[in-house]
Amino acid sequence: MGKGTPSFGKRHNKSHTLCNRCGRRSFHVQKKTCSSCGYPAAKTRSYNWGAKAKRRHTTGTGRMRYLKHVSRRFKNGFQTGSASKASA
């Protein structure tokens, strides 16, 4: 039996498992590194030749819990504390 189609039926071991950072089944068990996000590297794996992949994972594709409020706060000068007294 060669390494082609018939041999694929005999494969039953998992080389990849779930990644703690991106959640995909791309974490290589023996290498201990994720083929999708590059975990445990500090920086997320990203390449210019994968333009569509960049588009899927870039800022703005998620909830942006913090970032979506920044522009409004910037417009008001990042106000902090209590309301100022009205001058009469």
From Swiss-Prot:
InterPro entries registered for this protein in UniProt: Ribosomal_eL37, Ribosomal_eL37/eL43, Ribosomal_eL37_CS, Ribosomal_zn-bd
A Gene Ontology term for the protein's cellular component: preribosome, large subunit precursor
Keyword Zinc-finger: yes
Location(s) in or outside the cell: Cytoplasm
Cofactor: Zn(2+)
Gene Ontology biological-process entries: cleavage in ITS2 between 5.8S rRNA and LSU-rRNA of tricistronic rRNA transcript (SSU-rRNA, 5.8S rRNA, LSU-rRNA); cytoplasmic translation
Binding site for Zn(2+): C19, C22, C34, C37
Co-factor remark: Binds 1 zinc ion per subunit.
HAMAP family linked: Ribosomal_eL37 (MF_00547)
PANTHER family for the chain: 60S RIBOSOMAL PROTEIN L37, RIBOSOMAL PROTEIN L37
Family designation: Belongs to the eukaryotic ribosomal protein eL37 family.
Protein name: Large ribosomal subunit protein eL37A
Source organism per UniProt: Saccharomyces cerevisiae (strain ATCC 204508 / S288c)
Organism placement in taxonomy: Eukaryota, Fungi, Dikarya, Ascomycota, Saccharomycotina
